[in-house]
Amino acid sequence: MNQQHAPGGPGSTATWTSSAKDMVGTAIGQGRVWFTVGYGILNEVYWPSCSTPHIRDLGFIIAGDDFWSEVKRVNQYELTTPSSSLPIPKIVHHHERYRLELEIITDPARDVLLIRYHLEGEGLRLYPLLAPHIGGDGDDNYGSVSPHGLTAHKKGRHLILAAESGFNRASVGYVGSSDGWQDFSQNGYMSWEYQQAGPGNLAMMGELNRNSGVLALAFSDSAQGAATLAASSIAAGYQEARRQYAYLWAAWNETVNFPGLDKLPKNLSDAVRTSIAVIKTHEGRTFPGSLVASLSTPWGDTHKDAGGYHLVWPRDSVEVGFAMLACGLIAEVRALMAYLIAIQQPDGHWMQNNFTDGQPYWQGIQLDEVALPVLFAAKLHEQGLLGEMQGAAIRMARKALAFIAQYGPASPQDRWEENAGINPFTLSVSIAALVAGAKAGFLEEGDKQYALDLADDWNERLESWVYVKDTKLDRELGIDGHYVRLNPNSHSARFGDVMLRNRNNETISTRALLG
């Protein structure tokens, strides 16, 4: 059935994939594409920053005359990488009727993701199945079959899925009604060849001419640009892109200076190397120093969300910054410091989180996210790494410390983003920032003494605010006392209740709240 426009729009409600990722990856170079893998297939792919995904997933259907199978649902695969520090996933899907091998990289020179594929199985054909979510949104996408491949666009952003050997036929439809999976589910084979769909939640599918070859997923601000990038990447050759991908990662790994790494047991050293690579993969390029918390949307498989965890949290960024500092990644550390200075708000605080370009998303205020950048600046000052940023870092620290002094010790939100009050973690970080900023010489003499006095005062009162003794829990555990998670006021934590916003407003005694 070859029809021009697919029926059944706008399609079912758009969602993201699960956050249960197998791995993440990106090239080190001028290419601006990040990928995730989950359940053995390509999940969200981000471009031109690690804040913005443009597809939900790209999976595969394998079919013969009397048989069809979606590899994701079979869920029988193994994933390996060439080494613990080189994010090139090789995925092998096993089935009694077939063996499908995939390898995924991004082109270091272009905004293109490449998949090398090889299918073994008599009388079988391979069908890539792509769900575009242009601009981080599955709604209002437009798609079409073009001579160059499967294309999708929305609001001036375009992608194309092109095949080295081309497609024998292709179709674009609405998810849940006229997409390729529905075609196989209803008819047992590919019978639909819809040439256009949109606006809506789309899925696109094509039958590959060959069972071995290369797919290119390219992104651009124009349809022609995406097609050109895909074609040029395929023409330049997969092996050349892979060689450069591996070379650049190896060169970057040479800059890692983690004391004693080679003396650790192999399982521990591999874990460290993988962790360092994961950190690097979450780093932005258009906005150097930006570090998203996770290339995923934790609740995305149940509903759509524009932000997920692919956002910058100052808290997470500084904690990653200390890890990078421990690994001797000086360039990355300095870039992060400059980025934090740039996104600080005029009154001294940082937004709860933001996209990599600095645009705020959740706009709560958490005092630990105000204090941690000061601790980071103080550490860089101690190690002589601020350089020309010294003046800007001092101005940043002064504004942040003034904000802490004005609004502390209670935080408008605790670090779990539920409630206002005094939290042991936030309070301890705030006290440390006051002392570190003063000791680093970031403050004038009068302000320095005030910061130290305030830190002493909060430190002396910490136990009265967040420590309780001889509660039922303490007696059950045979301990003298414990620190509570949150005290909603400045009175003793032995009294009062907390209404937990992330537990359907359940009310619990302050002294019983842990975490």
Where are these regions (language model features)?
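Acidic/polar, glycine-enriched structural segments that form the non-catalytic walls/loops
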Residues: 1-8, 96-100, 107-308
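Long, well-ordered core segments of solenoidal/helical folds
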Residues: 249, 278-287, 328-351, 392-413, ...
